[in-house]
Each structure stands twice: as structure tokens, then as C-alpha cells.
Amino acid sequence: MDDVLPLIGEPDTLVVTGSSAGGFATALLTDDVMARIPSAANVTACVDSALLYYDGWLQTARDLWRAPDAICERLTGDNIVLDALVALHRSHNDVKILFTGSTHDHDLQLYQTYIDTGIMSFEATYASSALYLDYLRRMRADMREQVPGIGLYTWEAGYNPKDGSTQHMIMPAPNCFIPLSGEKSVAEWLYDAAQGDVRSYGLELLEE
């Protein structure tokens, strides 16, 4: 950040986004980035493909990561991204918050299976794909309830008929610029949100 800041001047608009591990960082650290760029009054935070349920997030953050108290205090449940986004909304309710992910994310379901069972597998199954969809449905409901005004973009690109899994991450992928849900691509959805038009697409993919 110290090297980048002199190169960008004093922008009035800021988009913080990251995919996979970067998505978790986006949820946790957007307010830190904002503090480094105080000129940006128009801020959008977009989490891409970051969702893991785990009862030990607080202990992990405190004892393993040695995270600062400001982060640990946000972690009250089993969904670190939800906790972080709720805290971000409460402290900066003018920040536009977005979440995007695929319906049966291949990589995330592998890690979720490891958390749930203690067994690390490198192969998805129809069962683990279905379970991940249930977790995503729960996440969607919680985000819409606890983060008013959030924009969601759900998609199912990269479907693998062998195991029912779908693509992991969209922001760094070429199909970020292709409409996957509705008439908008993820890139267009993010651009619109940064301009103040926050919408949701692909919610029908999460219906029971």
C-alpha cells in the first residue's frame, strides 16, 4: 500500500474486491483500505467465492493468526465472511456490499468437506456439491437479512457432470465479462453497483 498510494492520487471512488482467499480478505479488510484512502467517498466491496462455515473462526483468528482485536471482535459465529460484512455495514453503512459465487463451487466444497469431516479430498461428489448449495442458500438468506441493500450475483458456470461441481472464482476469469445470470455480466454488475445501482442476479438458482 505504501508503494501504491503515491501512484493513485486522491481518488473519490474505491472498489475493493478479491477472489477466494482474497474474498475473505475483502470482507475483513475493506475498512482498513478505506482508512488508507480517505478521499474515496464512494466505496464498493465485492467478495468473490469466499464461503466456509466453521465453529472455530474466532479461536483461529486469535490464537493462530494473531489477528488484531479489531478483527477478532467481529467474529461471533461460524461464518467469518458474514460476520465481517455485517460489521462493515454497521460501521460504514454507505459502503455498497456485493457477494458473488457459483452454486456448487468446486474448491470451496472440498475445503468445507475437510472442515466438516476432517478428511481432505481432492475430488468433489454430487453429495458434497449438494451440501455446498445448501450452505450457499443459508448464506444468501443471512446476508439479505443482516446486510440490508447487499447485491448478490449467483451463477453456475463450469458445471462438471461428473460430480455436479461448478467453477471457483469469477473475477480473474474470462467469463467475468460474459452474462451468466440475467442480462448482465459480473463485470457489468460490479460497475453498475459502483455507480450506485446495486442489484441481484441469479437468485432463482438458489430456489429449493
Specify the residue positions occupied by each region the protein language model found.
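C-terminal His-loop and adjacent cap/lid subdomain of alpha/beta-hydrolase
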Residues: M1-E208
